[in-house]
Regions:
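RecB-family 4Fe-4S metal-dependent nuclease core
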Residues: 1-305
Length: 305
């Protein structure tokens, strides 16, 4: 084995998603830090759009600026966050297109007509770009300290009836009914609602988090589109997600201790005609001979990098 085994102190949805897909992915990616893909256009583009929205919302709601001025600063933030990343040839998620998506969203969803506004938090700040990190009742397999689960979403908002919603923007391709309904059982949104509920309780805010609102922004070849998808989460659904997440992490710890990880070994190894980045390792009789072809970069859930 060419690099030391690592087990994360903090778990997030990206980790759990890979873990339940295939424990071996969790081994290669999070225990070993192996990466063939440095720089993901979807993460870079989505992060740039999110930064633009954050800046625009803070200037409008927190600083009292007009939306036109807030939009201009948001566009600057998109380019800055996108940085020097070079997307694949033919990609629709260039820096220019993401800046255009922000302008399109601002025009079609003006803040002065918005039904969901940032919640006032206990520290006097507004619920824009909200992060949480809550302890779990599970001990780290090496340090024996408690693990935690973290998340970060775009806004914690209140509607006109006083109900609280997690709000998250998603950039994507074409949207339709299937895209809208995928969020009803989505683990990321369930985790965000759980995290928001605990956050409000910790801050002494007596309000109910009823679910999540996903604002979809499609980046099309000849334009853009938007779709708003509310998805409710009842208390029993959040509890079910939480207990399942704990079971998944417990299973990962057991696999880590014994270094015996379940593998999918089926079509999931090449979903949508895109082979898993670790497929060649699983195909090799002695994968340790070729792990050197991968870069070492451990996922940091707190920084989303």
């Amino acid at each position: 084995m060419t690099n030391e085994l690592h087990f994360p102190d903090v778990i997030d949805n990206s980790m759990r998603k890979e873990l339940v897909k295939c424990q071996k992915i969790a081994h290669w990616k999070f225990e070993r830090g192996l990466n063939a893909e440095i720089g993901n256009e979807h993460l870079v583009a989505g992060g740039a759009f999110a930064k633009g929205m954050e800046v625009m919302r803070k200037m409008y709601y927190q600083d009292g600026e007009k939306q036109a001025a807030a939009l201009q600063e948001g566009i600057v933030a998109v380019y800055k966050q996108y940085g020097q990343f070079v997307p694949p040839s033919g990609s629709l998620k260039t820096a220019e297109r993401m800046a255009g998506a922000l302008a399109y969203y601002a025009e079609n969803k003006p803040f002065d007509g918005e039904e969901l506004v940032p919640l006032q938090l206990g520290d006097g700040m507004l619920g824009i770009e909200v992060a949480f990190n809550h302890e779990l009742p599970i001990l780290h397999p090496k340090t024996n300290k408690r693990l935690s689960y973290c998340g970060r979403f775009d806004m914690l908002a209140e509607d006109k009836q006083g109900k609280v919603w997690v709000v998250d923007e998603k950039t994507t391709g074409r949207m339709g009914d299937a895209w809208a309904h995928q969020w009803d059982l989505d683990s990321q949104m369930s985790g965000y609602v759980w995290g928001a509920q605990k956050l409000l309780k910790k801050e002494g805010i007596d309000k109910e988090v009823v679910g999540a609102v996903i604002n979809g922004i499609s980046i099309l070849k000849y334009g853009y589109d938007t779709m708003r998808c509310p998805t409710f989460r009842q208390d029993w659904e959040v509890l079910r997600w939480y207990e399942q997440m704990l079971d998944d992490v417990d299973g990962w710890i057991s696999a880590f201790k014994h270094q015996d990880h379940d593998q999918i070994l089926d079509h999931g190894c090449a979903l949508y005609n895109a082979p898993c980045q670790y497929a060649k390792l699983c195909k090799a009789r002695d994968p340790e001979k070729i792990v050197g072809s991968y870069a070492i970069k451990f996922w940091n859930p707190m920084l989303r990098d």
